[in-house]
């Protein structure tokens, strides 16, 4: 009963987006230049209470995450976890490993995320396990292996979004939410971002950031660019490099030498497991990303439903899932899992059907509990 009421409340919020219209339905400023789509259904009475532009494809923005979460929960289940394996590759000679330390990434969007305190300490765990194995030196490098297809910013995202923290993209290896803090006047970053180039510009209008997809050059505009206390948050161009550098430095600081020899090898190639890191459960990740409207994590959960495939295949599987449930997404445009692309289109009634299906499913209590509460928390607190 409680779950059904909760989902009905979500339906109203999910159908609002901007475009053009001469009508005013909700009475907010600027509504005459907006398209408002509404679909409200009383699930207990099985009766549609109100609908307006319910079949119109509207840019959903972050309400796309409601569909992504429903899909991920259905395919993966609430207890699914990403597992990142750390291995030694090469051969052992006493306390020395002749070869590399390899982090086999699985596009876990939560690795060392600040939003999951209980799962922090990845580097420390690797260090402690190597010590327990008696390894004191590694002749090769810390290699971060990535396998995610079409990683990085979604091509249809606006270039102006890429450098800002909300525009953090999903990669094969993700680290610290794929963001960093930069002090432009000094060039210092936290964490250290290898290969980053910063170009500063003075601008009286305020702070602006710009970085092209795949570029390691970040352009920063600001009023007082010489202020050493001024800092900005931006996105990592290559999270795998940041992870590799940080883990290498942590190992060296703990007394485990990493020689960094790219040609380090041995005739006998072996693999030994050092550590397996598990992410939070899918339900925990989904709740966090929905409450905060985290774009990168939404992309990670969408891609998780089709491991080894590209983004289009993940979207195809999502459409097939709902089509099998009698809800066609054929004429709804789905480009990403976060809703950051302006090319996404969802009809309010279609999203309403998805939410209704979830309310009547075995996840009828869990699914609504993942969303932020208006006036209480997350991006709906005020």
What do these predicted regions represent?
Residues 49-51, 302-382:
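Small-residue-rich helix-loop
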Residues 7-17:
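Bacterial N-terminal signal peptides
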Residues 1-6:
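Positively charged n-region of N-terminal signal peptides that target proteins for export
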